[in-house]
Amino acid sequence: MEEFNSSGSVVNGTGSTEVPQSNAEVIRGQIFEVGPRYIKLAYIGEGAYGMVVSADDTLTNQRVAIKKISPFEHQTYCQRTLREITILTRFKHENIIDIRDILRVDSIDQMRDVYIVQCLMETDLYKLLKTQRLSNDHICYFLYQILRGLKYIHSANVLHRDLKPSNLLLNKTCDLKICDFGLARIADPEHDHTGFLTEYVATRWYRAPEIMLNSKGYTKSIDIWSVGCILAEMLSNRPIFPGKHYLDQLNHILGVLGSPSRDDLECIINEKARNYLESLPFKPNVPWAKLFPNADALALDLLGKMLTFNPHKRIPVEEALAHPYLEQYYDPGDEPVAEVPFRINMENDDISRDALKSLIFEETLKFKERQPDNAP
């Protein structure tokens, strides 16, 4: 087994920088205006609203990842970009991806793209699980790092809401960093999340049952459910609840956990959803050891505490870290929390695209002001 190191991240950004055209490189038809500091660009991949390249940082002599985001034509992309920048420029934790630098033009009117510079990670858990089975040691270490990062996120009063294998970045020394905070929210049990299900369909498999049954009342336990799904996937190399649609997803969950008890049904505040569940024929639960016959017994014990139908009975992140399965890594003195909880309003659903653009511009400006080195 490889030696596990903790990668110290050098955060030495220059902030928002005006980028002249002469400092541009073209990667697969996309212009990257990130010179002269960032050179030798190489394609990594692309998502819905941006391309990612690796580059040499001439200031730190490190290889970094640069994400080019062109969000301003779409409301949703603007919202996600703003959330990501707002959160990640304030978070500082070994198991959460950092923002080292942000580049954009100096004029808001001319701002078409934003370049976000981050720590370079070689792969992600989704890709890793496609290619190899993990040893129990690797599963244990990855799970510990996920929960260590999540403890920090939850201590900041933030829900990630989109934890899944492709949002867990890995490097060669098995360091893990949580990324993609585009769907994150302040933890507010009264917030109505009705638009969430339509906002991002691809992550249905990792959604807690209460998300599909209630429009509000979400707590930090929705992220714990997602971590449970990820642990199950690490144990078997396949998703535990691969629902094809909303009802199929629910049936997959009930097919494993069994029918919810009368007590558990009480946590469903949507009467229609509760009546539907009560109308279903009784289903027994499937023992975890039958589903995962080769898994460590302690891993399955923790899995059962995370994949609990009732969110009020689901294990909180602090207790999960203290579980005997993670005993070899557990160190409360080295599991930092956020210095202050988030008080910034991230509910930007009703803000116009132009206003979102202004807020993104302002956030990049604030980031520059917080940097120790403000030299251009």
UniProtKB/Swiss-Prot annotation:
Tissue expression summary: In third instar larvae, expressed in eye imaginal disks. In adults, expressed in head and body.
Stretches assigned to the Protein kinase domain: 38-326
Q: Which coenzyme or cofactor does it need? A: Mg(2+)
Where's the motif TXY? 198-200
Q: GO BP, one example?
A: dorsal appendage formation
Post-translational modifications reported in the UniProt record: Dually phosphorylated on Thr-198 and Tyr-200, which activates the enzyme. Phosphorylated on tyrosine residue(s) in response to insulin.
Q: Please quote what the entry notes about the protein's domains.
A: The TXY motif contains the threonine and tyrosine residues whose phosphorylation activates the MAP kinases.
State the name under which the record lists this protein.
Mitogen-activated protein kinase ERK-A
